Amino acid sequence: MKIYFSCSLTGGRADEKIYGVIVDDLLAQGHEVLTAHLARPEVMAEEQRISPREVYERDIQWLKEADALIAEVSTPSHGVGYEIAFVLLQGKPALCCYRAGARVSKMITGNNLPNLTVRAYGDEGEALKVVQQFLESSSQPPPGQTRSLD
């Protein structure tokens, strides 16, 4: 599956470790993570080498190519919100996962679109379980129904 992984860059990198854990697990399962570089510590230096326009055009193309979006939303980010909305409007499945206790926008937690799954996790193992359940449910999205991972 082609996955667009979304996470905070300019909003803060406090959750960088879990970004890497999620992306590494996706890659190990054989998924193509179009944005795997976002989980790496050197991403900020890499992203400074290209213009905002180039980032926008590249990322929009990746969003169009992706089968699904997985966003780690513990750290607020304008870009992540934009990417989530873009994918949802395309009707593609999206997962927004976050650290239990993190303050997440009600525009995310209150959204009941059938192609959006929002889940908190307590630790790395639970985060990976949430992602795996999402991937399993996304392989055959139920038309017109809210996804349940319980």
Language-model features and meaning:
Residues 1-150:
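Conserved catalytic or regulatory cores that recognize and/or transform ribose-phosphate-containing ligands
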